[in-house]
């Protein structure tokens, strides 16, 4: 009887623990927007960069409030302290309490802030956070349910135009978007140039949809013999700074692509439908000189669902594409191979992967 009672108590305890865990997870999901919005506010206030300047000592909320020109420093410090406690609870920051008499909390950067504060090249993922939490980017989510029931694209329902058409109408948002892509590209390309050797021997390169040219500039810095073209829509390249080894060319990739030994497609295919991608890849096929290649950099969905970080990143991106771009989606490696073959290529091979992105090559 005693053993039976003990087993029952253990089962009850286990059940209670599972229920507590499930409740906590449900609460986290219900309030899921709080953390990213607080991170956005911290970035807007430059708090992470200010804490970084404090080095190992970090900074207190009162020290930070004194540096942001707040009209009421004491009230600002109290509010800053409250949002920094949330960031510390989520391991974005670390926190320690000063010795008496002050007993103030001091905050330092946790490991993740390596990517949320500017690196030696001035790049970080902070602009990406500002983009994803921007009002323009947030509004389409309120239309997702409607387009599932009634059809259409959430972004177009919100603004009446395709996302890339909207950029040309809203210079402020276009700049926010370009800054996010520019910074993310620098971080990603720095890693890719360490592990991917496929640019060796290339004499000419076109970066299709290359934005303001961050990737092209980094490629030619490592491979100075490459003649590079940064190819994007005219309103995009207008924000591109000049570079002696990179030519900025405006155009429409669905009409034609400049000719080169290699064509680079980084985070482009996921913006478009299969039909658009076949057209783009066919244009790339026609533009490749000799035995050149197309280099695709994209997240890839797994054939079998799992909850690994690469999968979570890809599926999250897929749902963003669902909301923003008509026909846009993430794909499996098999789906990319099918598109490449349909465009005329003989084969597609996966070469390497980094930061949740696969590098694949299409060969004639």
From Swiss-Prot:
Superkingdom field: Eukaryota
Record has Hydrolase as a keyword: no
Active site (UniProt): 270
Keywords annotated in UniProt: Methyltransferase, S-adenosyl-L-methionine, Transferase
A Pfam cross-reference name: Dimerisation
GO molecular function: O-methyltransferase activity; protein dimerization activity
Reactions accelerated catalytically: quercetin + S-adenosyl-L-methionine = isorhamnetin + S-adenosyl-L-homocysteine + H(+); luteolin + S-adenosyl-L-methionine = chrysoeriol + S-adenosyl-L-homocysteine + H(+); a 3'-hydroxyflavone + S-adenosyl-L-methionine = a 3'-methoxyflavone + S-adenosyl-L-homocysteine + H(+); rhamnetin + S-adenosyl-L-methionine = rhamnacene + S-adenosyl-L-homocysteine + H(+)
GO aspect biological process, one term: methylation
Known EC number: 2.1.1.42, 2.1.1.-
Annotated S-adenosyl-L-methionine binding sites: 232
Pathway involvement of the protein, from the record: Flavonoid metabolism
InterPro entries: COMT-like (IPR016461), O_MeTrfase_dom (IPR001077), Plant_O-MeTrfase_dimerisation (IPR012967), SAM-dependent_MTases_sf (IPR029063), WH-like_DNA-bd_sf (IPR036388), WH_DNA-bd_sf (IPR036390)
Gene3D superfamilies, per the entry: Vaccinia Virus protein VP39, Winged helix-like DNA-binding domain superfamily/Winged helix DNA-binding domain
Enzyme class (EC, first level): transferase
Subunit structure, as described in the record: Homodimer.
Described purpose of this protein according to its UniProt entry: Flavonoid 3'-O-methyltransferase involved in the biosynthesis of polymethoxylated flavonoids natural products such as pebrellin, aroma compounds which contribute to the flavor of peppermint, and exhibit pharmacological activities such as anti-allergic, anti-oxidant, antibacterial, anti-proliferative, and anti-inflammatory effects.
Family: Belongs to the class I-like SAM-binding methyltransferase superfamily. Cation-independent O-methyltransferase family.
Record-linked PANTHER family: O-METHYLTRANSFERASE (PTHR11746)
Protein name: Flavonoid 3'-O-methyltransferase 3
Record organism: Mentha piperita
């Amino acid at each position: 009887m005693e053993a039976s009672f003990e087993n029952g108590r253990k089962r009850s305890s286990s059940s209670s623990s599972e229920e507590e865990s499930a409740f906590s997870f449900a609460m986290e999901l219900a309030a899921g927007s709080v953390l990213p919005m607080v991170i956005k506010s911290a970035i807007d206030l430059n708090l992470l960069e200010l804490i970084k300047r404090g080095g190992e000592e970090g900074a207190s909320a009162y020290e930070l409030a004194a540096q942001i020109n707040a009209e009421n420093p004491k009230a600002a410090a109290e509010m800053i302290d409250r949002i920094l406690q949330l960031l510390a609870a989520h391991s974005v920051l670390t926190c320690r309490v000063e010795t008496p008499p002050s007993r103030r909390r001091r905050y330092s950067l946790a490991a993740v802030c390596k990517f949320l504060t500017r690196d030696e090249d001035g790049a970080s993922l902070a602009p990406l956070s500002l983009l994803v939490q921007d009002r323009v980017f947030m509004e389409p989510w309120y239309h997702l349910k409607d387009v599932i029931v009634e059809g259409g694209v959430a972004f177009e329902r919100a603004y009446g135009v395709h996302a890339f058409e909207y950029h040309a109408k809203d210079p402020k948002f276009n700049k926010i978007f370009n800054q996010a892509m520019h910074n993310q590209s620098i971080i990603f390309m720095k890693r890719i140039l360490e592990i991917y050797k496929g640019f060796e021997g290339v004499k000419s390169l076109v970066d299709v949809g290359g934005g303001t040219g961050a990737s092209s500039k980094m490629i030619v810095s490592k491979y100075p013999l490459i003649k590079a073209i940064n190819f994007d829509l005219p309103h995009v390249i207008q924000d591109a700074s000049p570079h002696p080894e990179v030519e900025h060319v405006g155009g429409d990739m669905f009409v034609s692509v400049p000719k080169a030994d290699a064509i680079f497609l980084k985070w482009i295919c996921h913006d478009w439908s299969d039909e658009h991608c076949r057209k783009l890849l066919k244009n790339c096929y026609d533009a490749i000189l000799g035995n050149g290649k197309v280099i695709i950099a994209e997240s890839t969905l797994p054939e079998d669902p799992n909850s690994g970080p690469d999968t979570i990143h890809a599926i999250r991106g897929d749902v963003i594409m669902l909301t923003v771009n008509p026909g846009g989606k993430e794909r499996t490696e098999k789906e990319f191979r099918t598109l490449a073959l349909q465009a005329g290529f003989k084969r597609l091979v996966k070469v390497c992967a980094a930061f949740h992105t696969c590098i694949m090559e299409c060969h004639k």
